[in-house]
Amino acid sequence: MMKACGFDIGLDHPFFLIAGPCVIESRELAFETAGRLKEITGKLGVPFIYKSSFDKANRSSGKSFRGPGMDEGLKILADVRAQLDVPVLTDVHDIDQVAPVAAVVDMLQTPAFLCRQTDFIRACAATLKPVNIKKGQFLAPHDMLQVARKARDAALEAGGDGNNILVCERGASFGYNNLVSDMRSLAIMRETDCPVVFDATHSVQLPGGQGASSGGQREFVPVLARAAVAVGVAGLFMETHPNPACAMSDGPNAVPLDRMAELLESLVALDRVTKRSGFLENQFV
């Protein structure tokens, strides 16, 4: 069990939610989405962390919108945090960003493509902030054990207790321009002794599927989210937007903001059943 962002995280507790637009498009959008998500999750009793990126460093095309940049993006996230009283998360992309980002946010996130970059992972963990490490699309779930150990060792060396690491499943490459979610990975990744998060929106992404940008199949977000909650997860990650068709990044796999309440309500009910009845796989070892 981990305590972060003011709440308990683990399989003995209700799932928490990381949600927000893929990228910070404007100050107004950040406040609109964070405010609405706070309202929805508050009514449902879902612990909530607001997420949005100041820079999308791995866009398919060099001409695609990347975000407002670190300085402006962190100002917006800091204001959301202070004025709406919600914890915030954003991703970091290189070691130089780690310290300034950690000074602002409540939780760091590392991109899937960078999960094997040892110095980078160690730098994030050494801040002693909670770090959500996304599993690369190219890794087997059991490979995350070594990634988690690197991070935990760095946290211990920095004077922490090593209990600040989360691991996140976001699908595995399945041929070209496609991902598949193996729900066994959620159980396997528990062997890291880290809370496991499921990214329900990037798992339906079609990477590079539109040539200069990625496609997605948002209609399958509820399917995979329900499956993950039925297996048992500590947290869910879902990107959302008021108008996904106009989103500047990852619109095809974003959940429409006006559908989030309905989706979360069904997931909360399923989570209660799953965690009340225990985890079936433990009976077959």
From Swiss-Prot:
Its main location: cytoplasm. The keyword rRNA-binding does not apply. It is found in: Cytoplasm. GO terms for cellular component: cytoplasm. Pathway: Carbohydrate biosynthesis; 3-deoxy-D-manno-octulosonate biosynthesis; 3-deoxy-D-manno-octulosonate from D-ribulose 5-phosphate: step 2/3; Bacterial outer membrane biogenesis; lipopolysaccharide biosynthesis. GO terms for molecular function: 3-deoxy-8-phosphooctulonate synthase activity. One of its GO terms (biological process) is keto-3-deoxy-D-manno-octulosonic acid biosynthetic process. The keyword Metal-binding does not apply. Its EC number is 2.5.1.55. It catalyses: D-arabinose 5-phosphate + phosphoenolpyruvate + H2O = 3-deoxy-alpha-D-manno-2-octulosonate-8-phosphate + phosphate. InterPro entries: Aldolase_TIM, DAHP1/KDSA, KDO8P_synthase. It comes from the Bacteria. Keywords: Cytoplasm, Lipopolysaccharide biosynthesis, Transferase. Belongs to the KdsA family. This is 2-dehydro-3-deoxyphosphooctonate aldolase. It comes from Bordetella pertussis (strain Tohama I / ATCC BAA-589 / NCTC 13251).
